[in-house]
Amino acid sequence: MKTLVLLSALVLLAFQVQADPIQNTDEETKTEEQPGEDDQAVSVSFGDPEGSSLQEESLRDLVCYCRKRGCKGRERMNGTCRKGHLLYTMCCR
């Protein structure tokens, strides 16, 4: 059940990322990495009003980042992110 909720949240997050307007500027089309460009934070929360087993600390404060070059430290790869025509790795901790 937890896996289903997590996957549903990730799918909704992917749709939200794709719904953002596409901005084609020279900065986005550069292949050079800019400082901080790969650290786009996304916060995902789980639970219902009455509380449930989904209120565990590990699922309540899931923080994800869209990174160019893979996950760092304690992060785990949880899919992909898209910004415009560029594809990033979604890393969550």
From Swiss-Prot:
Propeptide segment residues: 20-58
GO biological process entries: defense response to bacterium
Main location: secreted
Known tissue expression: Paneth cells of the small bowel.
Gene Ontology annotations for the cellular component aspect, listed alphabetically: extracellular space
Signal peptide, first to last residue: 1-19
Disulfide bond entries: 64-92, 66-81, 71-91
Keyword hit for Manganese: no
UniProt keyword list: Antibiotic, Antimicrobial, Defensin, Disulfide bond, Secreted, Signal
Ranges where the record places region Disordered: 22-56
Source species, domain of life: Eukaryota
Pfam families listed in its UniProt record: Defensin_1, Defensin_propep
Cell compartments where the protein resides: Secreted
Similarity comment text for this entry: Belongs to the alpha-defensin family.
Function statement: Probably contributes to the antimicrobial barrier function of the small bowel mucosa.
Name recorded for this polypeptide: Alpha-defensin 10
Organism: Mus musculus (Mouse)
